[in-house]
Amino acid sequence: MMKRLENGQLFTAMCTILIKINFIVYLLKKLYPMKGPLFYAKILLFGEYGIIKDSKGLAIPFSSYKGALKSSSNLSGEALKSNQNLIKLYDYLEANASELVSFDFTSFKNDIGSGMYFDSSIPQGYGVGSSGALVASIYDQYAHNKITILENLTRDKLLKLKEIFSFMESFFHGKSSGLDPLNSYLSLPILINSKTNIEPAGIPSQKEGKGAVFLLDSEQVGETEPMVNIFMNKMKNEGFRKMLNEEFVSYTDACIDDFLHGNINSLFGNVKNLSKVVLANFKPMIPMAFHKIWEQGLKTNDYYLKLCGSGGGGYILGFAQDYEKAKNSLKDYKLELVYRF
């Protein structure tokens, strides 16, 4: 009799605990309705424009900014705008069916109708992969037979993912390498050796030294497609093509090798050369207000600047051997730390 009572009490206690857990889960879903996992921003440390022409690139996840699919029965403001953009993305993917990937369009459409939106802190038009994170989240949620991050990611699987993401992100930019969504989806540093050779990269762990990589906020929104169009027009010029192959790509590749192998002194020499080449040949991609401080960094050696993504606004990437000195030189601007040497 006693055992029965004990068992009965235990059962009742377990039921009570389960009810409480379910109630907490219910409350959390109500307060923070989320359909999918978090996807992070990315920073292309090296390789902007060069990767279009098959040179090296190195991208790293940037966890300060992130986004996730959520839903709300009362959409307004940015959430409503995001929901409307998802409708356009849905229409694009459905109208441009690809053999690369298929989607559960029924669930996708129903979820949009139920108030789904992409809740993101990633600034748009800033070169840190806002559309890439969105594309990664849609693939993760709705792709059939998706390649998961838990699999053994062979080179062929990575290339297929990159191709899928290139197709999906072309909705936003007209032409996409697929690298931003790939980086966001994997949440790993990615080394691009060429269009057909990409791999996860091991980057040196951060140190508590003086040196740093940082973001400089231009406080202007940049658009990728016009910048890429300017670049493609420049590529028609033989002199520009020569500069790209002999200088831009050469310094970019050297920077990547130095960064991955921790050759800091050599890295800053190559970053300075790259910064000079970009200022001389990519001026339309650098906001006018930043031409002088770009030159100032090259003269003083307090910092060196380079494009972050396609340019035209958004963030500018900075490298400094003494971050405190760079902060003092750029005290009138908003800086954000990315990586410590």
Language-model-detected regions and their locations in the chain:
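Acyltransferase
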Residues: 201-256
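Glycine-rich, charge-dense phosphate/pyrophosphate-binding loop(s)
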Residues: 48, 52, 249-341
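Phosphate-binding site recognition
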Residues: 131
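ATP-binding N-lobe of GHMP and related small-molecule kinases
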Residues: 9, 27-127, 140-156, 304-307, ...
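Alpha/beta catalytic cores of group-transfer enzymes, especially the acyltransferase/condensing modules
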Residues: 156-201
